[in-house]
Amino acid sequence: MNQTIIKVSVFLFFIMFIYSGFGKITSFKKKTLGLSKKTGFPYPINELGMIGVILLEIIGSIIIVSYFLDKERTQKYITKEYIRYICLLLLAFMIVVTPLYHPPHKQIIAFLSNVTTFAGLLLIYNMI
């Protein structure tokens, strides 16, 4: 496999998660209120969940991208198991979020977009 193509592909793939994480920061209250309405959980619980998702999307993505951009240097600090764990957390997040925010009977294109993102995460998990 061409390593340059892999590096560029992983970088481009995770831009979406990083952008989404920063979007949640800039509209934190609005996003958290929307989540509270969808889940029915109290607002403080949704705040904690939103903070966790923001950290996962931004920091988790940066860690994975760093790993793929310079494996030799980052393998001293970040193990393959750690990268797999982050991928599994993102996969679990996608499983929960996709039907909640994009029910297929109402938003088939957004739903399929998330399914495709899920497939991309599986490929990245498999490349580690």
Question: Can you describe what each PLM-predicted range is?
Answer:
Residues M1-K30, Y43-I59, I63-I128:
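Extended, low-polarity transmembrane helix blocks
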Residues G34-Y43:
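Interfacial loop at the N-terminal end of multi-pass membrane proteins
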